[in-house]
Swiss-Prot record:
The chain crosses the membrane at residues 22-42, 151-171, 178-198, 211-231, 239-259, 264-284, 349-369, 376-396, 405-425, 433-453, 465-485, 495-515. Residues 1-21, 172-177, 232-238, 285-348, 397-404, 454-464, 516-553 are cytoplasmic. InterPro entries: MFS_dom (IPR020846), MFS_sugar_transport-like (IPR005828), MFS_trans_sf (IPR036259), Orgcat_transp/SVOP (IPR004749), Sugar_transporter_CS (IPR005829). The gene is Slc22a2. GO terms for biological process: acetylcholine transport; cellular detoxification; dopamine transport; dopamine uptake; epinephrine transport; export across plasma membrane; histamine transport; histamine uptake. GO terms for molecular function: acetylcholine transmembrane transporter activity; amine transmembrane transporter activity; choline transmembrane transporter activity; efflux transmembrane transporter activity; L-arginine transmembrane transporter activity; monoamine transmembrane transporter activity; neurotransmitter transmembrane transporter activity; organic anion transmembrane transporter activity. This is Solute carrier family 22 member 2. Tyrosine phosphorylation of the transporter leads to activation of the transport activity. TEA uptake is activated by tyrosine phosphorylation. Inhibited by cGMP, most likely through a cGMP-binding protein that interacts with OCT2. It comes from Mus musculus.
Amino acid sequence: MPTVDDILEHIGEFHLFQKQTFFLLALLSGAFTPIYVGIVFLGFTPNHHCRSPGVAELSQRCGWSPAEELNYTVPGLGSAGEVSFLSQCMRYEVDWNQSTLDCVDPLSSLAANRSHLPLSPCEHGWVYDTPGSSIVTEFNLVCAHSWMLDLFQSLVNVGFFIGAVGIGYLADRFGRKFCLLVTILINAISGVLMAISPNYAWMLVFRFLQGLVSKAGWLIGYILITEFVGLGYRRTVGICYQIAFTVGLLILAGVAYALPNWRWLQFAVTLPNFCFLLYFWCIPESPRWLISQNKNAKAMKIIKHIAKKNGKSVPVSLQSLTADEDTGMKLNPSFLDLVRTPQIRKHTLILMYNWFTSSVLYQGLIMHMGLAGDNIYLDFFYSALVEFPAAFIIILTIDRIGRRYPWAVSNMVAGAACLASVFIPDDLQWLKITVACLGRMGITIAYEMVCLVNAELYPTYIRNLAVLVCSSMCDIGGIVTPFLVYRLTDIWLEFPLVVFAVVGLVAGGLVLLLPETKGKALPETIEDAEKMQRPRKKKEKRIYLQVKKAELS
């Protein structure tokens, strides 16, 4: 009996219907960007210092410039105005309203040396050096409360983790289209509610809800488009779907620049989700899923609709459907299957580490850029541009060179770029940006490679389980990354880059221990997967020479 792939060969593997559907789902992919990396703009932390009652009035009376006001009233500023923990989180215990204070050096009358003046934590809020607003400036997520910004982003990734597993199961149980529309609706409503949140706690709840459904919706969109196209187009369409995410990065930078208020920015990036609800009339259910649920009549109706859209017709001989998988006895996948045999166990551990590393470096580099960059909008835009050549490199090398070497090199390039950035002087900003973009391109290639190779190393009956379990480390990485970046920068601004360099270089080395999958059929059994080892040419040649030598003697 024919499969969906057999029918698509006759009615079009990537014709008008698939192109229209891809365009619609690509919009969904781009709209996921603000949730995944929006913390750069929503959680932007500008320079700040304690608000002290009476300072503004004294500054106005004395006619100080902003720089003079900071120099006279803020502790811990360096000679060039460098910020520190003291300047941002501590204040002089001085009554600035007293009339005896001098305009030239107001603290000289209180102590011969400023370092002898008592300090105390900020009690009256902060003054932020920015014309816009972020969740940091509105809810004062600085100093003793800075961990609350880490929690904000980590909770999104907790939602990613739970939603990808739970909603992924529901999509297999109740259908792709239904779950896609539900995730879009919840994402849209919770996004609007977050924009009007009265306090930090409610904002946290609604952001978690967005995380719970948004990544799951992105994954369902990925599954849908790959199930609508023919076998020969799946990999290319999958890469292009991720390129749409990159386009979303570029658009996000422009929207964030135009809307420096975080609430308006949140509204702007959320409202398009309501338009995606129109997909109810534009995108049908996956015929492959319908067949797997023994709903062949509905599947054939959709297939005929696709054929009509493509200007084709379904041959009568192909109108009896069967699932792509064998309908005989099926093995039940088990988590133990991922670690029971030596080669698969090695694959599982290396892939889990690489998923974790890809997430930490990808999100971490973006977050660090928001802290260290001079212009976060331009830096974000430039670093997003390098994801286009990253996708081109993958398409160019994956079937020519293979998976293993480009993947290993990309990890090592990302790690080396992070390490090099530590030693580049601040006055060579152009070089810092160039090296940062190189690192971003490297980790982008690694991220997309691990998505592909993960499915190619496991036998059929545990393939989905293996991808699910290994990729869950991606969300674990996303949970720890905010704490890693924001806390380590409190110690030293470049400290996170050193950590990124180490984990990236280790990941590249571990990839070389995996077998090459280029040109190899997908393993069907445990035995097939266990035999996917690199050819040991040198050892075989040595044995051959020893045999010939023995024959001659």
